[in-house]
Amino acid sequence: MLQPKRTKYRRTHRLQHDKGEAHTGNKVSFGKFGLQAKTSAWITARQIESARIAITRYMGREGQVFIRIFPQLSLTSKPIGVRMGKGKGSPEKWVAVAKVNTMLFEVSGVKDEVAKEALRLGSYKLPVKSKIVLKESE
């Protein structure tokens, strides 16, 4: 699963994910088709990995998948039954902040129907509403 190799601080602030749109990382850059978020949410490393597996299994051994988001925020929690205070909890999982219009995955090297179906299957594993977009021709 994805997580940072090292960070300056183990515990991070909880960033807001429901404000505004993504102005960078919102276009198809590497592949031909992309999966674009239409709502905002935190996406965990497990959800990213689950979507990646769903996409690659449908595509078989051909084509290439690009993951455009990375879980760099740590979410902390305290054990059940522990009283308030005594510091912040330990990091439990890593999440990526996906704003509206963030490009989540990209696919290239397969037929158009295969790419669309693979991204559709991958979108079911994610907690955001999404749409499949085609690369804009320059």
UniProtKB/Swiss-Prot annotation:
GO terms for biological process: translation. The keyword rRNA-binding applies. Keywords: Ribonucleoprotein, Ribosomal protein, RNA-binding, rRNA-binding, tRNA-binding. One of its GO terms (molecular function) is structural constituent of ribosome. Residues 1-14 have a biased composition (Basic residues). Residues 15-24 have a biased composition (Basic and acidic residues). Disulfide bonds: none annotated. It comes from the Bacteria. InterPro entries: Ribosomal_uL16, Ribosomal_uL16_bact-type, Ribosomal_uL16_CS, Ribosomal_uL16_dom, Ribosomal_uL16_sf. Residues 1-24 are annotated as: Disordered. PROSITE patterns: RIBOSOMAL_L16_2. Binds 23S rRNA and is also seen to make contacts with the A and possibly P site tRNAs. Part of the 50S ribosomal subunit. Belongs to the universal ribosomal protein uL16 family. This is Large ribosomal subunit protein uL16. It comes from Mycoplasma mobile (strain ATCC 43663 / 163K / NCTC 11711). The gene is rplP.
